[in-house]
């Protein structure tokens, strides 16, 4: 019964994507030509590289882009809610990173801080997962979306006070959820550990983000919805459905509960964080380079492929478990089908960057975003291959899976968001980053740290899996063979955390200086803010 309900709900999510497609076709959103890719620019802006952190720029040139004065009326409405969301995300990143390092160290120093219940492995690891997922990735992703969406819709954000209320509710809920997890009160499901009673606040907060974005889209001043808008609208429509169904108390139990759990857990990555990351990349890559994406037709193929194929991917995590074989097989098929939208995104974004490699030499935000886009391709290909039974036999229950999860959530989404914040904050505050060299230091710390982290978990996980498959070897061998790789993981995690702390301090230094005085052009543009936006 529950398996059937789950599949029905999965198809419902896919049908929601199909409904979007039908609406898009009927409203001529699918009449594609490359000219639609210029939606991200205002007249005269195309061909102008746009990055306030470019190497060699003096203090004056490092300020907001010339064409931002044209958008000042739009940006002024979004400024406060976006700044609150970004600041909240950065705080949760710093805190979540500390818990992540603690959890990593406990894997090879198991007795460290074990006398304190809130600091035992099970709790600090869960705190790390929830704080970076629902704190850093979600709040920052929403903040970037609420800043980008009005720009691509060419109209001011509607109901801008609602996201401020949503940010307050979300932060309160996340703080309460963290306290509950630390005390041992959880729902006991991966990615769903925060008690459902607290999740009600998160749901209310989510509504405060969805309504303004939908209203802004409905009141847009352009006929065509740029591909970034589709990803953002999809994310903010899919996630509430997933979150509500997975958190209904008492509806599922036993094997069915595990099935629903992984249906939700994987869709959080694919139908929530992925659209936030890919959508941001589709805006910032052409915006920083000053040229449109390589193929606009391919960009929409990538979105609709994600909408139609992804919702049933997660059950491959239960290969070998007591679930119907056909359900797992269906999930594997959908996992392999994901090659189609991923290749579309990969060709589009990588070719756009490859044709303009000179910008990478001067723009660190573009390095973050383009490297994040590369890691999206790698994580997606790896996930599709890992879903195959022959591969999963080796990698299941190993640290290989942990490395894969971080390749997507950190290597892809976090890197894109780092670049997005570096590009956005000077436009929110009117002030340049005070220590441009620290941006490069942050980049190399997290790149080096993540390289050590991912390579060690991938290699160690494969050795761990092979050791567990060898019936002639005791289980303890799979533990001892892994230890040096876990130590390397901790070293990589410490480097990443140092980068995060530099990022947080740099962010605070900009925000603490306050908003810079507006130019005459910006003041004039703000006078054109529509009354309906307030």
Regions found by a protein language model. Give the residues of each.
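Feature marks short, highly hydrophobic, charge-poor N-terminal signal-anchor/signal peptide-like helices
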Residues: 1-10
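Amphipathic, hydrophobic secondary-structure cores in small proteins
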Residues: 7, 16-38
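Hydrophobic cores of alpha-helical transmembrane segments in multi-pass integral membrane proteins
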Residues: 9-21, 83-108, 121-155, 159-183, ...
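Membrane-interface helix-loop junction between the first two transmembrane segments
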Residues: 23-32, 102-116
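Extramembrane terminal tails and long inter-domain/linker segments of multi-pass membrane proteins
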Residues: 29-83, 113-116, 464-483, 510-534
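Membrane-proximal first intracellular loop
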Residues: 71-79, 116-118, 122-126, 156-157, ...
């Amino acid at each position: 019964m529950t398996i059937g309900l789950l599949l029905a709900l999965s198809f419902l999510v896919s049908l929601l994507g199909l409904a979007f497609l039908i609406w898009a076709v009927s409203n001529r959103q699918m009449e594609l030509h490359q000219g639609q890719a210029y939606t991200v620019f205002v007249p005269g802006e195309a061909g102008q590289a746009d990055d306030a952190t470019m190497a060699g720029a003096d203090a004056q040139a490092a300020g907001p882009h010339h064409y931002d004065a044209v958008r000042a009326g739009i940006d002024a409405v979004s400024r406060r809610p976006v700044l609150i969301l970004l600041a909240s995300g950065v705080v949760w990143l710093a805190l979540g990173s500390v818990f992540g390092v603690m959890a990593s160290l406990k894997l090879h120093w198991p007795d460290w801080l074990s006398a304190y219940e809130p600091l035992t492995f099970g709790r600090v690891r869960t705190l790390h997962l929830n704080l970076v997922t629902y704190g850093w990735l979600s709040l920052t992703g929403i903040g970037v979306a609420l800043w980008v969406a009005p720009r691509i819709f060419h109209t001011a954000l509607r109901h801008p006070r609602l996201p401020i209320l949503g940010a307050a509710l979300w932060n309160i809920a996340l703080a309460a959820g963290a306290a509950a997890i630390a005390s041992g009160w959880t729902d006991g499901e991966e990615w769903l550990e925060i008690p459902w009673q607290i999740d009600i606040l998160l749901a209310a907060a989510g509504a405060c983000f969805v309504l303004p974005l939908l209203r802004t889209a409905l009141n847009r001043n352009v006929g065509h919805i740029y591909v970034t808008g589709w990803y953002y609208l999809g994310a903010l429509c899919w996630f509430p459905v997933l979150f509500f169904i997975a958190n209904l108390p008492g509806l599922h139990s036993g094997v069915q509960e595990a099935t629903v759990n992984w249906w939700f857990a994987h869709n959080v990555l694919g139908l929530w964080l992925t659209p936030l990351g890919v959508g941001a990349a589709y805006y910032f890559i052409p915006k920083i380079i000053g040229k449109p994406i390589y193929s606009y037709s391919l960009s929409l193929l990538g979105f609709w492929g994600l909408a139609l194929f992804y919702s049933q991917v997660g059950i491959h995590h239960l290969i070998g478990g007591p679930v119907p074989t056909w359900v797992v097989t269906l999930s594997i098929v959908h996992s392999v089908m994901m090659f189609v939208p991923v290749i579309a995104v990969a060709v589009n974004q990588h070719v756009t960057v490859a044709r303009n490699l000179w910008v990478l030499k001067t723009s660190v935000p573009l390095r973050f975003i383009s490297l994040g886009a590369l890691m999206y391709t790698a994580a997606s290909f790896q996930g599709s291959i890992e879903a195959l039974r022959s591969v999963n036999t080796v990698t299941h229950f190993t640290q290989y899976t942990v490395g894969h999860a971080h390749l997507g959530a950190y290597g892809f989404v976090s890197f894109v968001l780092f670049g997005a914040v570096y590009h956005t904050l000077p436009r929110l505050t009117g002030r340049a980053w005070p220590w441009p060299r620290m941006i490069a230091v942050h980049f190399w710390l997290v790149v080096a740290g993540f390289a050590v982290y991912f390579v060690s978990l991938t290699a160690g996980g494969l050795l761990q899996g092979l050791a567990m498959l060898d019936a002639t070897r005791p289980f303890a061998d799979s533990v001892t063979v892994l230890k040096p790789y876990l130590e390397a993981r901790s070293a990589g995690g410490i480097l990443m955390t140092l980068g995060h702390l530099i990022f947080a301090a740099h962010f605070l230094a900009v925000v603490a200086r306050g908003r810079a005085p507006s130019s005459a052009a910006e003041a004039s543009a703000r006078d054109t803010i529509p009354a309906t936006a307030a």
